[in-house]
């Protein structure tokens, strides 16, 4: 599945969630999720290049420690957190921590804080949120040059969707 169809599929999942109302909210939801996913993959590269690299995101809130699917003993991909626990974790722990991150000593922390300052988690259904995360896990790999090259396609699609959102955005 290409990135554009993955984004469309994710938006279709979000349409089923009672908390997400309109394209503007779907785009906002997808933006912060993509940010954390892509940032995590960049951090993996930085860790490979520098063994002393320290993430500006508290360990508990890094994508790899709550969203990334892990293989069980049978080789099946499983979420680290159950749907019923996911929304409370995001709303009560992840968002407050990233909105209040001390950005005084790091430009990277400042970017993280700015991304989350005005962001919201609109999704209310943890199972649907897990379905979105699973799609991101399956399709978005920015270590792959082809995927990186298609990032512009994602951006263009999101802009077109936002334009189509009209006054809702």
Question: Where are the model-predicted features located?
Answer:
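Non-catalytic, mostly N-terminal accessory regions of nucleic-acid modification and defense proteins
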Residues: 1-169
């Amino acid at each position: 599945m290409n990135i554009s169809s993955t984004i469309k599929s994710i938006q279709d999942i979000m349409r089923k969630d009672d908390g997400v109302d309109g394209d503007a909210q779907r785009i906002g939801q997808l933006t912060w999720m993509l940010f954390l996913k892509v940032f995590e993959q960049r951090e993996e590269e930085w860790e490979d290049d520098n063994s002393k690299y320290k993430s500006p995101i508290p360990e508990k809130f890094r994508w790899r420690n709550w969203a990334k699917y892990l293989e069980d003993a049978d080789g099946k991909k499983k979420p680290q957190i159950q749907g019923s626990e996911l929304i409370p974790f995001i709303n009560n722990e992840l968002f407050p921590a990233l909105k209040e991150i001390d950005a005084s000593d790091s430009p990277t922390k400042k970017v993280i804080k700015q991304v989350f300052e005005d962001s919201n988690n609109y999704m209310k259904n943890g199972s649907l949120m897990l379905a979105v995360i699973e799609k991101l896990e399956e399709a978005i790999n920015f270590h792959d040059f082809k995927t990186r090259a298609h990032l512009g396609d994602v951006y263009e699609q999101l802009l077109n969707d936002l334009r189509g959102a009209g006054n809702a955005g």
